[in-house]
């Protein structure tokens, strides 16, 4: 995980992933933790999972019956559960190259920052039409607000094909809020 935080190419091309990695536990844990382990742990509050969802990550899963490639959205089966069968392993994590005129961001809310579990994690990856503020592609993912990390599809749809304004972004945020169903454990 620490490599995701510090590698210049990750910082440049996948800033949401780099920011999510920086918010993940303490440095000692980041030095040992792996992306695959974080995916297979399938925690609803996993810090890097919303960033990976927003970046349209694919997973290559290998087992005795062959291999399959799944979008990360289809890997989670519930809190702490994945669709991996007995004797299957997560062999590869694939990130598409970002489109031109795109950016990504991850924001975590937790009482104590990186040393605490997220009470909310939000990642977005937005691509604009060349030379304009019209949204060509939008992916918004939420963590710690559902049994698994989720995409906020309705919020994404609000932005697609429209010029980004403060009002439109607020409308998308309201749609993302509707997708959130956090547990009541406070």
Label every PLM stretch briefly.
Residues 1-186:
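C-terminal structural segment of proteins
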């Amino acid at each position: 995980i620490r490599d995701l935080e510090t590698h210049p190419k990750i910082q440049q091309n996948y800033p949401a992933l780099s920011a999510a990695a920086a918010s993940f536990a303490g440095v000692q844990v980041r030095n040992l933790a792996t992306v695959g382990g974080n995916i297979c742990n399938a925690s609803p509050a996993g810090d890097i999972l919303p960033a990976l969802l927003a970046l349209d990550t694919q997973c290559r899963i290998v087992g005795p019956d062959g291999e399959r490639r799944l979008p990360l959205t289809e890997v989670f089966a519930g809190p702490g559960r994945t669709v991996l069968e007995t004797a299957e392993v997560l062999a590869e994590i694939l990130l598409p190259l970002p489109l031109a005129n795109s950016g990504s961001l991850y924001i975590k809310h937790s009482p104590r920052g990186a040393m605490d579990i997220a009470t909310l994690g939000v990642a977005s990856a937005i691509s604009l039409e060349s030379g304009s503020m019209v949204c060509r592609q939008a992916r918004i993912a939420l963590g710690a607000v559902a049994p698994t990390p989720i995409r906020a599809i309705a919020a994404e749809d609000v932005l697609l094909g429209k010029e980004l304004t403060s009002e439109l972004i607020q409308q998308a945020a309201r749609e993302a809020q509707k997708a959130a169903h956090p547990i009541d454990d406070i």
